[in-house]
Protein backbone atom coordinates (compact mmCIF):
# COMPACT_ATOMS: atom_id res chain seq x y z
CA UNK A 1 0.00 0.00 0.00
CA UNK A 2 1.12 3.55 -0.64
CA UNK A 3 1.55 5.63 2.49
CA UNK A 4 0.36 9.18 3.12
CA UNK A 5 1.79 11.91 5.34
CA UNK A 6 5.30 13.16 6.02
CA UNK A 7 7.97 10.65 7.07
CA UNK A 8 11.76 10.37 7.10
CA UNK A 9 13.67 7.52 5.49
CA UNK A 10 17.42 6.94 5.86
CA UNK A 11 19.99 4.89 3.94
CA UNK A 12 23.76 4.58 4.28
CA UNK A 13 26.73 3.84 2.08
CA UNK A 14 30.41 3.20 2.75
CA UNK A 15 33.58 3.87 0.79
CA UNK A 16 35.79 1.22 -0.77
CA UNK A 17 38.20 1.70 2.15
CA UNK A 18 35.69 0.49 4.74
CA UNK A 19 37.01 -2.81 6.19
CA UNK A 20 34.00 -4.84 5.01
CA UNK A 21 34.32 -3.38 1.52
CA UNK A 22 38.03 -4.21 1.38
CA UNK A 23 36.93 -7.81 1.87
CA UNK A 24 34.24 -7.61 -0.80
CA UNK A 25 36.77 -6.16 -3.25
CA UNK A 26 39.33 -8.88 -2.53
CA UNK A 27 36.74 -11.66 -2.88
CA UNK A 28 35.40 -10.27 -6.16
CA UNK A 29 38.88 -9.60 -7.56
CA UNK A 30 39.77 -13.25 -6.97
CA UNK A 31 36.49 -14.27 -8.62
CA UNK A 32 37.21 -12.10 -11.67
CA UNK A 33 40.72 -13.49 -12.02
CA UNK A 34 39.38 -17.05 -12.08
CA UNK A 35 36.50 -16.28 -14.47
CA UNK A 36 38.96 -14.64 -16.87
CA UNK A 37 40.61 -18.01 -17.56
CA UNK A 38 37.74 -20.34 -16.65
CA UNK A 39 34.24 -18.91 -17.16
CA UNK A 40 32.72 -22.04 -15.61
CA UNK A 41 34.73 -21.76 -12.39
CA UNK A 42 32.79 -22.48 -9.22
CA UNK A 43 33.86 -19.90 -6.68
CA UNK A 44 32.86 -19.07 -3.12
CA UNK A 45 35.57 -16.92 -1.54
CA UNK A 46 35.32 -15.22 1.85
CA UNK A 47 37.80 -12.67 3.16
CA UNK A 48 38.56 -11.36 6.65
CA UNK A 49 40.81 -8.40 7.36
CA UNK A 50 42.14 -7.26 10.69
CA UNK A 51 45.20 -5.37 11.90
CA UNK A 52 48.02 -6.28 9.51
CA UNK A 53 46.36 -9.47 8.29
CA UNK A 54 44.20 -10.75 5.42
CA UNK A 55 42.64 -14.21 5.61
CA UNK A 56 41.09 -15.72 2.46
CA UNK A 57 39.05 -18.92 2.71
CA UNK A 58 36.40 -20.74 0.73
CA UNK A 59 35.69 -23.31 -1.92
CA UNK A 60 36.88 -23.16 -5.53
CA UNK A 61 36.68 -25.69 -8.34
CA UNK A 62 38.42 -24.47 -11.48
CA UNK A 63 41.02 -25.13 -14.15
CA UNK A 64 42.35 -21.58 -13.75
CA UNK A 65 45.19 -20.32 -11.59
CA UNK A 66 45.08 -17.12 -9.57
CA UNK A 67 47.96 -15.63 -7.60
CA UNK A 68 45.80 -14.88 -4.58
CA UNK A 69 48.43 -13.14 -2.40
CA UNK A 70 49.26 -10.79 -5.28
CA UNK A 71 45.57 -10.09 -5.96
CA UNK A 72 45.08 -9.31 -2.27
CA UNK A 73 48.01 -6.88 -2.14
CA UNK A 74 47.13 -5.18 -5.43
CA UNK A 75 43.53 -4.70 -4.30
CA UNK A 76 44.49 -3.24 -0.95
CA UNK A 77 46.99 -0.86 -2.56
CA UNK A 78 44.51 0.23 -5.24
CA UNK A 79 42.02 1.15 -2.53
CA UNK A 80 44.69 3.35 -0.98
CA UNK A 81 46.09 1.48 2.01
CA UNK A 82 49.82 1.82 1.46
CA UNK A 83 51.02 2.80 4.92
CA UNK A 84 50.49 1.59 8.47
CA UNK A 85 49.74 5.23 9.31
CA UNK A 86 46.52 4.80 7.31
CA UNK A 87 45.58 1.67 9.23
CA UNK A 88 46.82 -0.90 6.71
CA UNK A 89 49.61 -1.49 4.19
CA UNK A 90 49.16 -3.76 1.19
CA UNK A 91 52.92 -4.02 0.78
CA UNK A 92 53.57 -5.61 4.15
CA UNK A 93 50.31 -7.13 5.43
CA UNK A 94 50.21 -10.85 6.09
CA UNK A 95 48.13 -12.95 3.68
CA UNK A 96 46.79 -16.36 4.68
CA UNK A 97 44.97 -18.53 2.12
CA UNK A 98 42.80 -21.56 2.93
CA UNK A 99 40.90 -22.62 -0.20
CA UNK A 100 39.34 -26.04 -0.79
CA UNK A 101 37.19 -27.58 -3.53
CA UNK A 102 33.43 -27.19 -3.88
CA UNK A 103 31.47 -29.95 -2.16
CA UNK A 104 30.71 -32.70 -4.69
CA UNK A 105 27.22 -33.00 -3.21
CA UNK A 106 26.52 -29.34 -4.03
CA UNK A 107 28.18 -29.69 -7.44
CA UNK A 108 25.96 -32.61 -8.45
CA UNK A 109 22.82 -30.54 -7.89
CA UNK A 110 24.15 -27.68 -10.00
CA UNK A 111 25.57 -29.84 -12.79
CA UNK A 112 22.65 -32.30 -12.89
CA UNK A 113 19.45 -30.64 -11.80
CA UNK A 114 16.56 -32.24 -9.95
CA UNK A 115 14.73 -32.22 -13.27
CA UNK A 116 17.49 -34.38 -14.81
CA UNK A 117 17.62 -36.81 -11.93
CA UNK A 118 13.85 -37.31 -11.72
CA UNK A 119 13.19 -37.57 -15.43
CA UNK A 120 11.37 -34.23 -15.64
CA UNK A 121 13.94 -32.85 -18.09
CA UNK A 122 12.64 -31.30 -21.27
CA UNK A 123 14.70 -30.90 -24.43
CA UNK A 124 15.85 -27.53 -23.09
CA UNK A 125 19.49 -27.62 -22.00
CA UNK A 126 18.79 -24.83 -19.51
CA UNK A 127 16.89 -27.38 -17.41
CA UNK A 128 20.16 -29.21 -16.74
CA UNK A 129 21.55 -26.55 -14.38
CA UNK A 130 20.05 -26.52 -10.91
CA UNK A 131 20.13 -23.70 -8.38
CA UNK A 132 23.33 -23.62 -6.33
CA UNK A 133 21.36 -23.27 -3.10
CA UNK A 134 17.89 -22.81 -1.74
CA UNK A 135 16.89 -19.25 -0.98
CA UNK A 136 14.81 -16.20 -1.73
CA UNK A 137 15.92 -13.10 -3.59
CA UNK A 138 14.29 -9.70 -4.03
CA UNK A 139 14.43 -7.04 -6.72
CA UNK A 140 13.14 -3.49 -6.44
CA UNK A 141 12.64 -0.39 -8.56
CA UNK A 142 10.96 2.96 -8.01
CA UNK A 143 10.45 6.22 -9.88
CA UNK A 144 12.39 8.16 -7.19
CA UNK A 145 15.36 8.69 -9.53
CA UNK A 146 16.11 8.45 -13.28
CA UNK A 147 17.97 5.18 -12.61
CA UNK A 148 14.82 3.88 -10.85
CA UNK A 149 16.44 3.55 -7.44
CA UNK A 150 15.36 4.83 -4.01
CA UNK A 151 16.71 8.35 -3.56
CA UNK A 152 18.29 7.86 -0.09
CA UNK A 153 20.64 5.06 -1.17
CA UNK A 154 21.32 6.70 -4.54
CA UNK A 155 22.50 9.90 -2.85
CA UNK A 156 24.44 8.04 -0.16
CA UNK A 157 26.37 6.13 -2.85
CA UNK A 158 27.09 9.32 -4.79
CA UNK A 159 28.48 10.92 -1.65
CA UNK A 160 30.69 7.91 -0.92
CA UNK A 161 32.00 7.82 -4.47
CA UNK A 162 32.73 11.54 -4.36
CA UNK A 163 34.49 11.13 -1.01
CA UNK A 164 36.81 8.63 -2.64
CA UNK A 165 37.27 10.76 -5.76
CA UNK A 166 38.46 13.84 -3.85
CA UNK A 167 40.87 11.67 -1.87
CA UNK A 168 42.37 9.82 -4.82
CA UNK A 169 42.56 12.90 -7.06
CA UNK A 170 44.36 14.92 -4.39
CA UNK A 171 41.61 17.55 -4.07
CA UNK A 172 41.50 16.73 -0.34
CA UNK A 173 44.86 15.01 0.18
CA UNK A 174 44.46 14.69 3.94
CA UNK A 175 41.57 12.21 3.61
CA UNK A 176 42.18 8.51 4.20
CA UNK A 177 40.35 5.52 2.63
CA UNK A 178 37.85 4.58 5.36
CA UNK A 179 34.53 6.42 5.30
CA UNK A 180 30.75 6.26 5.54
CA UNK A 181 27.84 8.39 4.40
CA UNK A 182 24.20 8.51 5.45
CA UNK A 183 21.24 10.33 3.89
CA UNK A 184 17.83 11.10 5.41
CA UNK A 185 15.08 12.08 2.98
CA UNK A 186 11.67 13.48 3.89
CA UNK A 187 8.85 11.83 1.96
CA UNK A 188 5.34 13.18 1.51
CA UNK A 189 3.49 9.96 0.91
CA UNK A 190 5.67 8.17 -1.63
CA UNK A 191 7.26 11.34 -3.05
CA UNK A 192 10.71 12.52 -1.95
CA UNK A 193 10.35 16.22 -1.11
CA UNK A 194 13.30 17.30 1.06
CA UNK A 195 16.87 16.39 1.88
CA UNK A 196 16.84 16.53 5.66
CA UNK A 197 20.18 15.22 7.01
CA UNK A 198 23.53 14.13 5.59
CA UNK A 199 26.14 12.38 7.73
CA UNK A 200 29.70 12.04 6.45
CA UNK A 201 32.26 10.20 8.54
CA UNK A 202 35.70 10.04 6.99
CA UNK A 203 39.11 8.93 8.10
CA UNK A 204 41.67 11.72 7.92
CA UNK A 205 45.27 12.57 8.71
CA UNK A 206 46.19 13.61 12.24
CA UNK A 207 45.95 17.26 13.29
CA UNK A 208 43.11 18.14 10.89
CA UNK A 209 40.74 20.81 12.21
CA UNK A 210 37.22 19.37 12.11
CA UNK A 211 35.31 22.65 12.23
CA UNK A 212 37.53 24.96 10.22
CA UNK A 213 38.90 22.63 7.54
CA UNK A 214 37.20 19.23 7.24
CA UNK A 215 33.57 20.32 7.53
CA UNK A 216 33.80 23.28 5.10
CA UNK A 217 35.77 21.16 2.62
CA UNK A 218 33.25 18.32 2.69
CA UNK A 219 30.33 20.72 2.43
CA UNK A 220 31.80 22.27 -0.73
CA UNK A 221 33.81 19.50 -2.41
CA UNK A 222 31.62 16.50 -1.59
CA UNK A 223 28.05 17.49 -0.70
CA UNK A 224 28.00 20.57 -2.93
CA UNK A 225 29.45 18.67 -5.86
CA UNK A 226 26.89 15.86 -5.57
CA UNK A 227 23.94 18.25 -5.23
CA UNK A 228 25.10 20.12 -8.34
CA UNK A 229 24.92 16.88 -10.34
CA UNK A 230 21.39 15.78 -9.46
CA UNK A 231 18.49 16.98 -11.59
CA UNK A 232 15.62 17.02 -9.11
CA UNK A 233 14.25 20.58 -8.94
CA UNK A 234 11.32 19.40 -6.83
CA UNK A 235 13.66 18.26 -4.02
CA UNK A 236 14.14 20.90 -1.31
CA UNK A 237 17.85 21.17 -0.46
CA UNK A 238 17.68 24.60 1.16
CA UNK A 239 18.16 23.59 4.78
CA UNK A 240 20.31 20.47 5.01
CA UNK A 241 21.71 19.40 8.35
CA UNK A 242 25.29 18.24 7.66
CA UNK A 243 27.00 16.18 10.35
CA UNK A 244 30.71 15.57 9.80
CA UNK A 245 32.55 13.02 11.96
CA UNK A 246 30.03 13.36 14.82
CA UNK A 247 32.36 11.47 17.21
CA UNK A 248 35.20 13.94 16.61
CA UNK A 249 38.50 12.86 15.08
CA UNK A 250 38.71 9.77 12.86
CA UNK A 251 42.40 8.99 12.44
CA UNK A 252 42.43 5.31 13.40
CA UNK A 253 40.56 3.60 10.56
CA UNK A 254 40.62 0.70 8.16
CA UNK A 255 41.30 -2.80 9.47
CA UNK A 256 43.27 -1.32 12.38
CA UNK A 257 40.07 0.29 13.62
CA UNK A 258 37.63 -2.53 12.83
CA UNK A 259 37.88 -6.04 11.45
CA UNK A 260 36.15 -6.56 8.12
CA UNK A 261 34.32 -9.48 6.52
CA UNK A 262 32.97 -10.29 3.07
CA UNK A 263 29.21 -9.95 2.75
CA UNK A 264 28.54 -7.76 5.75
CA UNK A 265 27.10 -4.77 3.87
CA UNK A 266 24.18 -6.41 2.07
CA UNK A 267 21.79 -3.48 2.59
CA UNK A 268 24.37 -1.01 1.29
CA UNK A 269 24.83 -3.34 -1.70
CA UNK A 270 21.13 -3.34 -2.58
CA UNK A 271 18.37 -0.80 -1.84
CA UNK A 272 19.37 0.87 1.41
CA UNK A 273 16.63 -0.85 3.40
CA UNK A 274 13.73 0.37 1.27
CA UNK A 275 13.15 -3.15 -0.06
CA UNK A 276 13.27 -6.52 1.61
CA UNK A 277 16.38 -8.70 1.39
CA UNK A 278 16.66 -12.46 1.16
CA UNK A 279 19.83 -12.46 3.28
CA UNK A 280 22.36 -13.73 0.77
CA UNK A 281 25.50 -11.72 0.08
CA UNK A 282 27.00 -11.24 -3.40
CA UNK A 283 30.76 -10.80 -3.35
CA UNK A 284 33.07 -13.74 -3.95
CA UNK A 285 30.32 -15.89 -5.51
CA UNK A 286 30.20 -17.06 -9.11
CA UNK A 287 26.83 -16.76 -10.90
CA UNK A 288 25.83 -20.39 -10.30
CA UNK A 289 25.03 -19.08 -6.81
CA UNK A 290 21.48 -17.72 -7.05
CA UNK A 291 22.17 -15.47 -4.06
CA UNK A 292 23.96 -13.33 -6.61
CA UNK A 293 22.62 -14.11 -10.07
CA UNK A 294 18.93 -14.26 -9.11
CA UNK A 295 19.16 -11.02 -7.11
CA UNK A 296 20.61 -9.40 -10.22
CA UNK A 297 17.83 -10.91 -12.32
CA UNK A 298 15.15 -9.61 -9.98
CA UNK A 299 16.55 -6.08 -10.21
CA UNK A 300 16.40 -6.52 -14.00
CA UNK A 301 12.77 -7.64 -13.74
CA UNK A 302 11.76 -4.84 -11.35
CA UNK A 303 13.51 -2.11 -13.33
CA UNK A 304 11.90 -3.24 -16.58
CA UNK A 305 8.48 -3.38 -14.92
CA UNK A 306 8.75 0.23 -13.72
CA UNK A 307 10.29 1.37 -17.02
CA UNK A 308 7.35 -0.28 -18.79
CA UNK A 309 4.91 1.76 -16.72
CA UNK A 310 3.36 -1.24 -14.98
CA UNK A 311 3.84 0.39 -11.57
CA UNK A 312 5.65 3.34 -10.00
CA UNK A 313 7.17 1.12 -7.34
CA UNK A 314 7.59 -2.62 -7.44
CA UNK A 315 9.24 -5.38 -5.44
CA UNK A 316 9.60 -8.90 -6.82
CA UNK A 317 10.65 -12.06 -5.01
CA UNK A 318 11.84 -15.32 -6.49
CA UNK A 319 12.65 -18.51 -4.56
CA UNK A 320 14.62 -21.65 -5.39
CA UNK A 321 15.25 -25.16 -4.08
CA UNK A 322 18.85 -26.35 -4.22
CA UNK A 323 19.50 -28.44 -7.29
CA UNK A 324 16.21 -27.55 -9.00
CA UNK A 325 16.19 -25.43 -12.15
CA UNK A 326 12.68 -23.99 -12.05
CA UNK A 327 11.93 -21.42 -9.33
CA UNK A 328 9.57 -22.65 -6.62
CA UNK A 329 7.90 -19.27 -6.23
CA UNK A 330 7.42 -15.76 -7.64
CA UNK A 331 5.80 -12.89 -5.72
CA UNK A 332 5.04 -9.35 -6.88
CA UNK A 333 4.26 -6.33 -4.64
CA UNK A 334 3.30 -2.99 -6.20
CA UNK A 335 2.45 -0.99 -3.05
CA UNK A 336 -0.76 0.32 -4.57
CA UNK A 337 1.09 2.00 -7.46
CA UNK A 338 0.12 -0.52 -10.16
CA UNK A 339 -1.33 0.65 -13.48
CA UNK A 340 -3.03 -2.68 -14.16
CA UNK A 341 -4.09 -5.76 -12.20
CA UNK A 342 -1.11 -7.06 -10.12
CA UNK A 343 -1.98 -10.62 -11.15
CA UNK A 344 -1.60 -9.54 -14.76
CA UNK A 345 1.79 -7.98 -13.95
CA UNK A 346 2.96 -11.23 -12.37
CA UNK A 347 1.78 -13.24 -15.39
CA UNK A 348 3.54 -10.81 -17.74
CA UNK A 349 6.78 -11.22 -15.79
CA UNK A 350 6.47 -15.01 -15.99
CA UNK A 351 5.93 -14.82 -19.76
CA UNK A 352 8.75 -12.33 -20.38
CA UNK A 353 11.57 -13.56 -18.13
CA UNK A 354 13.07 -17.04 -17.82
CA UNK A 355 14.21 -17.23 -14.19
CA UNK A 356 15.95 -20.60 -14.29
CA UNK A 357 19.59 -20.14 -13.17
CA UNK A 358 21.02 -21.21 -16.52
CA UNK A 359 18.75 -18.79 -18.37
CA UNK A 360 19.68 -15.91 -16.08
CA UNK A 361 23.37 -16.59 -16.66
CA UNK A 362 22.77 -16.77 -20.43
CA UNK A 363 20.52 -13.73 -20.75
CA UNK A 364 22.65 -11.45 -18.56
CA UNK A 365 25.96 -12.86 -19.86
CA UNK A 366 27.24 -13.43 -16.34
CA UNK A 367 30.20 -15.76 -17.01
CA UNK A 368 32.52 -12.76 -17.33
CA UNK A 369 34.94 -10.95 -14.99
CA UNK A 370 32.58 -8.03 -14.24
CA UNK A 371 32.23 -8.34 -10.49
CA UNK A 372 35.10 -6.44 -8.83
CA UNK A 373 33.62 -3.16 -10.10
CA UNK A 374 30.44 -3.88 -8.11
CA UNK A 375 32.21 -4.47 -4.79
CA UNK A 376 31.72 -0.88 -3.59
CA UNK A 377 29.05 1.80 -4.16
CA UNK A 378 26.21 -0.63 -4.79
CA UNK A 379 25.28 -3.34 -7.26
CA UNK A 380 22.16 -1.57 -8.53
CA UNK A 381 21.33 1.77 -10.12
CA UNK A 382 24.94 2.42 -11.07
CA UNK A 383 25.38 5.36 -13.42
CA UNK A 384 29.19 5.14 -13.52
CA UNK A 385 29.55 1.61 -14.93
CA UNK A 386 27.62 -0.54 -17.42
CA UNK A 387 25.91 -3.54 -15.81
CA UNK A 388 23.67 -5.94 -17.78
CA UNK A 389 20.94 -6.17 -15.14
CA UNK A 390 20.42 -2.41 -15.39
CA UNK A 391 19.25 -2.74 -19.00
CA UNK A 392 15.58 -2.02 -19.74
CA UNK A 393 15.65 -4.17 -22.88
CA UNK A 394 12.51 -6.11 -21.93
CA UNK A 395 10.32 -3.12 -21.03
CA UNK A 396 8.32 -2.99 -24.28
CA UNK A 397 7.81 -6.74 -24.36
CA UNK A 398 6.72 -6.68 -20.71
CA UNK A 399 4.31 -3.83 -21.34
CA UNK A 400 2.74 -5.68 -24.25
CA UNK A 401 2.43 -8.86 -22.20
CA UNK A 402 0.59 -6.89 -19.52
CA UNK A 403 -1.82 -5.52 -22.12
CA UNK A 404 -0.77 -1.87 -21.82
Curated annotation (Swiss-Prot):
Keyword Secreted part of the UniProt annotation: no
Alphabetic keyword roster: ATP-binding, Cytoplasm, Magnesium, Metal-binding, Nucleotide-binding, One-carbon metabolism, Potassium, Transferase
Amino-acid positions noted as binding L-methionine in the UniProt annotation, renumbered to this chain: 59, 102, 258, 289
EC id: 2.5.1.6
Cofactor: Mg(2+); K(+)
Cofactor: how and how many bound: Binds 2 divalent ions per subunit. Binds 1 potassium ion per subunit.
Binding sites annotated in the UniProt record for K(+): 46
Keyword Cytoplasm tagged: yes
HAMAP family: S_AdoMet_synth1
Name of the protein: S-adenosylmethionine synthase
